[in-house]
Amino acid sequence: VDNNYSKKYLFEATPDIAKQMKALLKDAIQNKNEMVDGIFLTHAHIGHYSGLMYLGKEAANAKNVNVFAMPRMKKYLETNGPWSQLVTNKNISLTQIEKEQSIFLTPNLMATPFLVPHRDEYSETVGYRIKGPNKTALFIPDIDKWNKWDKSIVEEIKKVDYAFLDATFYSGKEINNRDISQIPHPFVIESLEMFKTLDSIERKKVIFITTIKVLYTSTIMCSFFSFICHVS
């Protein structure tokens, strides 16, 4: 939420998109329109883009909501129903973004996508660096494993004020007998071990997201898919 310029943006269109938008509305001082000014997508997996369906004619019947997507993600939405209907009916307006190219949303707010390794059956997978006038955030809701990324997550945490990171699975026990190579994510217990090298100030930056089990574990900081914050 950038109240200085009356703008609201959402990162991820989850199945709970209506709740996400209502939550953003609570922080908006001037812009009381429930619909956001734009939605940033990371990839084409169910929990990250399926909320777009609620912008269609059977639901909100939105008008040209700006949806920011990477090239493969954009093409996927344009060429596969029911998502293509959102484009045809002008419920959404797709804006193609590119890796490492910043999008200036307001004079106070900038988002920069970057590629991360993940199951890319239908689209690329990206995270975002989000920069306000005073603080920055790292947003990586899904990634295969931290050591498969060409950057050090520990070093990237040090560069920002907040780090919203993948915590889909707490440990292997959570997925029983399923092959983790088919649904790869960094286990929370692996992340905690890796982040031990960070000092207490750096560790406090980490907020685990895309989580079920951790959400109810009071000893670990956690949040939901999308985060809500004032531009600062």
Predicted regions located by residue number:
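Active-site metal-binding motif and surrounding structural segment of the metallo-beta-lactamase
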Residues: 6-68, 161
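Short, conserved loop/helix-junction motifs that constitute active-site signature segments
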Residues: 31-34, 57-63, 86-88, 154-159, ...
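Short, well-ordered alpha-helix to beta-strand connector turns
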Residues: 36, 89-91, 160-161, 167
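A short, active-site helix/loop in glycosyltransferases that binds the activated sugar's phosphate group
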Residues: 72-82
